[in-house]
Regions:
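Structural recognition of the beta-strand scaffold that forms the well-ordered cores
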Residues: 3-8, 43-46, 66-71, 88-91, ...
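SH3-family beta-barrel domains
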Residues: 178-196, 209-213, 221-223, 244-246
Length: 246
């Protein structure tokens, strides 16, 4: 299953027009993303507010991630304070996968961002979280927090933004988007055989491991006849015919 490093802003010193700050709202978006990530089977690690950008980069580079995803909001230059608007998603020049992810994210953000200009994807050499990460990287600037309309949009749209970004991640990784549901527990009933945990909801997909008959699993979501499950820290799809909810 896909595995991302989720890096919401730790910049509490960036105030929002109308109250709050960048660290607060970006971490609220990350919090709201977590149930969607789990239901979709996207594994993740996350920074914490005590870390700085260099530490987030180091933590990302210490793992094997399929995407580094940074969550931020923007600020206008002093001479244009409060005047600029719109989402921008950055990637590093030459990072083809980072570019692909950023374009998908920008296109989907344009569907929910209510003002002009629409979201766009741009390359940059000035952001370490795209130029210094081992994994492909996208750095989202959701909107301008010094603009009264943009700041209010972020503040009022936490859940909508979180869902939209995870839809983009599912599109990027080529997996189904699954709305969160209450986490359940199931018991495997496979007549003595091991039940495969697969990377896609298909019997043709690669098996990441097996669940022994009688074992219990955590169920995060469902698409068709497949559950998104976790067993022994392995996350993937398992055939629902062989799992009984308990």
């Amino acid at each position: 299953m896909p595995n991302i490093y989720l890096s919401p802003s730790t910049q509490e010193f960036n105030p929002y027009n109308g109250g709050g700050n960048e660290e607060l709202y970006m971490n609220l978006i990350a919090d709201a993303m977590e149930p969607f990530l789990r239901s979709c089977g996207i594994e993740f690690s996350r920074n914490n507010p005590q870390m700085n950008a260099a530490q987030s980069i180091a933590a990302s580079n210490a793992g094997n991630y399929d995407l580094h995803l940074a969550l931020h909001s923007n600020a206008s230059p002093d001479e244009l304070s409060g005047q600029l608007q719109g989402p921008v998603v950055y990637y590093a020049p030459g990072d083809t996968e980072g570019q692909r992810a950023s374009v998908i994210i920008a296109n989907n953000l344009s569907e929910i961002y209510p003002y002009s200009p629409p979201a766009r994807a741009e390359s940059t050499t000035n952001i370490g979280e795209v130029t210094q990460t081992r994994a492909p990287a996208s750095f989202i600037e959701f909107a301008y927090h010094d603009n009264v309309l943009d700041a209010a949009w972020i503040r009022d749209s936490i859940d909508l933004i979180a869902e939209n970004v995870v839809v983009s991640l599912c599109d990027y990784f080529g997996i189904p988007f699954i709305l969160p549901s209450p986490v359940r527990t199931g018991k495997v009933n496979s007549d003595g055989a091991y039940l495969n945990i697969r990377t896609r909801p298909s019997t043709a997909a690669y098996s990441k491991g097996g669940i022994p008959d009688g074992a219990t699993v955590t169920i995060y979501g469902q698409t068709g006849n497949w559950y998104v499950v976790e067993y022994n820290n392995i996350v993937g799809y398992a055939n629902a015919d062989y799992i009984t909810i308990i």
